[in-house]
């Protein structure tokens, strides 16, 4: 009898402590889910266009986090559309093939040989890696380029001195509608052809913004290598969490937004001006940045809205 009591005395505290720990963990889970619930309800059935690139594409752990975030978005009824670049991998292949990489005004100078490599890497390699990653997690993905189904019509950028660098002339969403209606995730590389059938390399932010506008998306989200829009580019704590469209324009005019952040902010402004609900610039170096931005009160980056 004594030994039975001793055994019970040893077991009961363990059970009690275990139950207490589980309760704490469960409370945290419930809190997270409760915070996410109104956002899940709001965005279910809505379209979110995500530009995927930068560090989030270059590191395996961040890739996995992005793919899981996208799979979760799909599972709660959100309709994500992914647009991607692939600059680092393009540079690696240019180096292998001994083709010099050239940049001017922040854009890749793209001659015919470089364009062949860009198309091979973006359409044939990077796109399929993303599609495969999503498919493995149960998010049915379909790989496309801007040329497929005339999704994006390109035009030469500027005066043509950058070679086969393009801009978006027109977006035709007819090819996307049946894909989205069937629950698939379109994964789109930023290569598109002109009306003459000549392939051009287009900035992926630009492609994402124009597709978001054409789809009348709820959100445009740009994954970047910065926390978002900073009032002081050397001080991450100066992050601006939310801006109105007019305020974003003013920051560009005042030079607060400068350098590589300028085209990203301009991309957001154009998308909002064409009816996108909100545009976000977030730090893709943070694991699960997508979920933190979409499903939490605080978010993680900068959200630009058309009105208060």
Swiss-Prot record:
SUPFAM superfamilies: Carbamate kinase-like. It is found in: Cytoplasm. It comes from the Bacteria. GO terms for molecular function: acetylglutamate kinase activity; ATP binding. It holds the Pfam family AA_kinase. It catalyses: N-acetyl-L-glutamate + ATP = N-acetyl-L-glutamyl 5-phosphate + ADP. Pathway: Amino-acid biosynthesis; L-arginine biosynthesis; N(2)-acetyl-L-ornithine from L-glutamate: step 2/4. The record marks 51, 264 as: Transition state stabilizer. The keyword Chaperone does not apply. Its main location: cytoplasm. GO terms for cellular component: cytoplasm. GO terms for biological process: arginine biosynthetic process via ornithine; L-arginine biosynthetic process. Its EC number is 2.7.2.8. Keywords: Amino-acid biosynthesis, Arginine biosynthesis, ATP-binding, Cytoplasm, Kinase, Nucleotide-binding, Transferase. Substrate binds at residues 86-87, 108, 201. It is an enzyme of class 2 (transferase). Belongs to the acetylglutamate kinase family. ArgB subfamily. Catalyzes the ATP-dependent phosphorylation of N-acetyl-L-glutamate. This is Acetylglutamate kinase. It comes from Prochlorococcus marinus (strain MIT 9313). The gene is argB.
């Amino acid at each position: 009898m004594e030994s039975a009591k001793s055994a019970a005395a040893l077991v009961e505290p363990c059970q009690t402590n275990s139950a207490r720990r589980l309760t704490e963990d469960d409370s945290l889970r419930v809190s997270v889910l409760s915070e996410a619930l109104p956002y899940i309800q709001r965005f279910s059935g809505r379209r979110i266009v995500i530009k995927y690139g930068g560090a989030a594409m270059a590191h395996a752990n961040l890739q996995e986090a992005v793919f899981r975030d996208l799979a979760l978005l799909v599972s709660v009824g959100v309709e994500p559309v992914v647009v991607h670049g692939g600059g680092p991998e393009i540079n690696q292949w240019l180096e292998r093939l001994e083709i010099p990489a050239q940049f001017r005004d922040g854009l890749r100078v793209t001659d015919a040989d470089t364009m062949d490599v860009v198309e091979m890497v973006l359409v044939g390699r990077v796109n399929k890696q993303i599609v495969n990653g999503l498919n493995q997690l149960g998010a049915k993905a379909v790989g496309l380029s801007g040329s497929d189904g005339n999704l994006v019509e390109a035009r030469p950028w500027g005066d043509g001195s950058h070679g086969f660098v393009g801009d978006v002339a027109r977006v035709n969403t007819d090819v996307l509608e049946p894909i989205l209606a069937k629950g698939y995730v379109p994964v789109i590389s930023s290569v598109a052809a002109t009306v003459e059938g000549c392939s051009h390399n287009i900035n992926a932010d630009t492609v994402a913004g124009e597709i978001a506008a054409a789809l009348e998306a709820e959100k445009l989200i740009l994954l970047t290598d910065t926390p978002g829009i900073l009032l002081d580019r050397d001080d991450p704590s100066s992050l601006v969490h939310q801006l109105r469209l007019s305020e974003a324009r003013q920051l560009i005019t005042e030079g607060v937004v400068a350098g590589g952040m300028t085209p990203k902010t301009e991309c957001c402004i154009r998308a909002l001006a064409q009816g996108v609900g909100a545009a976000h610039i977030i730090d893709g170096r943070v694991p699960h940045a997508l979920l933190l931005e979409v499903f939490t009160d605080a978010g993680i980056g900068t959200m630009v809205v058309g009105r208060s």
